Amino acid sequence: MKRWDRGGRPQFNEFNITEHAESTDHPDDIWNTIHNQVIQAVKDVSNRYMEEVGCQQQWPYSNALEQVRLKHYQVDQNDRFDEHADVGDHASARRFLAMFFYLNDVEKGGETKFEHRSIKPVQGRCLAFPPMWMFPHSGAAPITEDKYIIGTYLHYV
């Protein structure tokens, strides 16, 4: 795990699942298995998103998945991610859909907050949203238990 501690912009531990899966020679490695499961989940969530939003005709024909990352927000470190947009420079401008897969319930705190909505972390759920400047959000510090998510982005190719 790599520690990010920029005083809330961001502040959490991160493990790059894609990097690890691509660096192993063992196809039955647990991280390869997890990586493949996440890829399938991204496809399923993308299809549901297109149906619910009604954007099948506008969906980018050519797209790819950014690296898959496990993020750990610790209660005792006041880990959080203050308000930001996930597209903020040329390198991130190809992102068009963010996905956060919640791996555990957090009783208090840990919400992903948008201007008019707050999403509570619930195990097994996925939050998908456009990562552009029109959707600034924050990751509140968990209060009762650590928060674990797997995050990735779909991007243009």
State where each predicted segment sits.
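Fe(II)/2-oxoglutarate oxygenase catalytic core
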Residues: 1-126, 134-157
